[in-house]
């Protein structure tokens, strides 16, 4: 059983809670195959408001567009299948993950499908590098908040989601204290984006992660 809570910045509140379970399907000395099933509950705000300056140079209080909300109050089913293989210092893997909203309010971010494939190579007993490719297909926002009426493209639910292809180069290092402690650093670069409507494209990003294995 695992659980995750996401806290985006600079918002000082957590946006999601995701308890999930891993189910071992098959495991040999050469490879592992397991499934994941879980629920993701959006616990962030979906009605954040603030003061803006309109085109008439007047201040007004509005409800922020969807992209500036930290949650949509929905509950989603998370399902995934992961395959991992080891061979003489090399590692290979693939994962397919699906997110489907099953309990919705007046609007929710679109369902998504994510596919990952990766290869890794041990440099030493403690250090390894990895190369990963990712495909993300996300549907537009479902529903609408009739109070979100700002004259910007992000107020249109159709201008969300789309398809994104990314590559990522990472380094992983075991840390000396305890057992199964690992730190990972990864550079993610979008290589192709087919987005719905006018949107700001994703830029490159850096991920820093800590992993504890039992």
Language model features: what each stretch is:
Residues 104, 109-214:
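Outer membrane beta-barrel transmembrane domains
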